Amino acid sequence: MGALQRVVDTTLRDGEQMPGLTFFAQERLALLNLLKQAGVGAIEIPGPAIDPRSAAPEWSRQQDLAVIVWNRAVPADIELSLRAGFRHIHVSLPVSAAHIEKKLGVTFAWILCQLEKCIKKIRAAGALAYVGAEDASRASDEYFLQYAKLAADTGAQRIRFADTVGCMQPVEVESRLRRLQAECPIPLEFHGHNDFGLALANHLAAENAGIHWHSGTVRGIGERAGNADLRGLQHWLGNSAKKNSPGHSPDYKQFSETALSATEKIVTAAMQRAKQAVRLPFQS
């Protein structure tokens, strides 16, 4: 298996949250095809309720790549994604007390109830459910594991541990995720942010803890300081696989350097437009 086959690319969702950055329609489709050629395991896009462009049929009809559509935990949003034909549905809710109480003004019991309702809706439609645990890095283990257990019991495929504010350090990532991995009833995915320049290092720590799914973006673009860079994930996850499995070498036949370089050119062009739109400092 190629290293990128364990990566969910979120360039078209989290990446496009970079201030001033917007991809043209032809760029979005080009990125879809190039990321497929590059060998990523899945791509993530915003749901039609958030971005109407996602309702176009070419996004939901992909046969050889999982297109995971990201939704708020709102049944009406999920319904729009299902009607558009998507079979891989992601739903996200906060699990930290700070976000539950101060951001949403609800209780953890409400979060669990909403999660169960949303997953059941997805599964009843015959689609696969993926769950995001927003601000998991600042949540208690108790809250996270209760949330994960309910997700597993209700039929979710995988749960994303999100370091939403990018506050974790590698030592903490490895120790905490190793502990959670031992008790989590479904596969874990790590989603790091780069606020302190540690996103890629944190993903490597997560890999060392036994987490085999990761999310990242082309050139590490995203909100605030961005996410883990896709090229960095390709190189380091490949090296990690070789190191942890003596005699094993990543299958680079499933990776296209040409395709990845082409995605970077598209993203760089969009970044240049964003720089001019909001006058952000930019380094090529």
Where are these regions (language model features)?
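Catalytic cores and adjacent flexible loops of soluble metabolic enzymes
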Residues: M1-S284
